[in-house]
Amino acid sequence: MNSTSLYAAIDLGSNSFHMLVVREASGSIQTLTRIKRKVRLAAGLNNDNHLSAEAMERGWQCLRLFAERLQDIPQPQIRVVATATLRLAVNAGEFIAKAQTILGCPVQVISGEEEARLIYQGVAHTTGGADQRLVVDIGGASTELVTGTGAQTTSLFSLSMGCVTWLERYFSDRNLAQENFDDAEKAARDVLRPVADELRFHGWKVCVGASGTVQALQEIMMAQGMDERITLAKLQQLKQRAIQCGRLEELEIEGLTLERALVFPSGLAILIAIFTELNIQSMTLAGGALREGLVYGMLHLAVDQDIRSRTLRNIQRRFIVDTDQANRVAKLADNFLKQVENAWHIEPISRELLLSACQLHEIGLSVDFKQAPYHAAYLVRHLDLPGYTPAQKKLLATLLLNQTNPVDLSSLHQQNAVPPRVAEQLCRLLRLAILFAGRRRDDLVPEITLQALNENLTLTLPGDWLAHHPLGKELIDQESQWQSYVHWPLDVR
């Protein structure tokens, strides 16, 4: 592999050190390596902000691992940044001098505002949805809050609170009592209050979380079969569960890994304070943050206004998808959706996911015609899809699995991006669009009227169409039968 196409970003965080190695390929990035080590540097800071020798040694040990991987990458294509703990430590110079010797490249201690800007860039390049956003990143010793529209930030704040420092300060006795949470939340709200007005002034349409705490919450919610939107009610529920556990070493929540458990209660307390102080309705997980911001900055790639469209284009190119056919199916599905929207009230995001499934429905053919829907579902489940959340990826895979043949109803109910009933409706529209676009020519798609009454679909074709299309009639009869097996009434006229 040509090393000039390789880029590395290293983030010396207060809780973990991370390394991301990517390959640049025709304007998009392909992840090659991700290494994360819990160094807990912030835990080595004493009251005088002096970093202990033990904490420094843990950091250097980790960097020796990273250094081996960096040998193959040109130095101008490596960026190493240090954040909150090394901003605070009075003896940071000692740590950084040795770190630079180990890595063989400069280490830059960045300001809180620069960290916030890079986090925002990472989110803007990798996260779909409305482009007026609030980004929240709870680190080990600092929390970044950024508002922005598209690629531009409108306000940037880096606050001195993090999941490691709050752990040492409010959960040092390892008790998970109501009082510990109350003290941690109150302190976090006090830190937030001076910046809350400006953040609210700039406003946001979506709130995105980009940290280990939010990642942990996502994993918990997926494991417990909840939808992936983080709300204050869910945070309070998890807090009560933590309080029931009583002690940090006894903290057990389905979906919470041992690795994340130590700083989970302190991160949770900070997040509850942020939700309360800023009156956040819901939050989703970001596709990337600081390291992605560093990489995209080195590549000088512009922020794509529609990340999901860029992702779909890249995948279609990679798997040699017939884009004319993908567009034909999408156009037909959208037409069907418009005809039933008064009865089914399908939300814009669900429409977008249906059209995404249309764009990708033939990627399984790149493996083999036999079992193409299974191959398509497998590929979507395992591909990196910037702009789509894990739950949305699961829904796309499920729709592609059920694009033809008998319907696996349980799979539509096991995804949690949309309610099961909506997943069923999207699946029905996708199947019909694929069926009627089957001859791969615009002029051969009949005029179809679709009406919905509750779950009953009535499909009306031009007068003598069925008589002149015996194969088409056979396929429609088969589809009607498959839909009836799962109690989806389809009446064809």
From Swiss-Prot:
Reaction catalysed by this enzyme: guanosine 3'-diphosphate 5'-triphosphate + H2O = guanosine 3',5'-bis(diphosphate) + phosphate + H(+)
UniProt keyword annotations, A-Z: Hydrolase
Top-level taxon: Bacteria
Entry keyword annotation includes Metal-binding: no
Signal peptide: none
EC number(s) per entry: 3.6.1.40
Alphabetical GO biological process terms: guanosine pentaphosphate catabolic process; guanosine tetraphosphate biosynthetic process; nucleobase-containing small molecule interconversion
Pathway connected to this protein: Purine metabolism; ppGpp biosynthesis; ppGpp from GTP: step 2/2
Family (UniProt): Belongs to the GppA/Ppx family. GppA subfamily.
Name of protein: Guanosine-5'-triphosphate,3'-diphosphate pyrophosphatase
Organism: Salmonella dublin (strain CT_02021853)
Lineage per the UniProt record: Bacteria, Pseudomonadati, Pseudomonadota, Gammaproteobacteria, Enterobacterales
Gene (name only): gppA
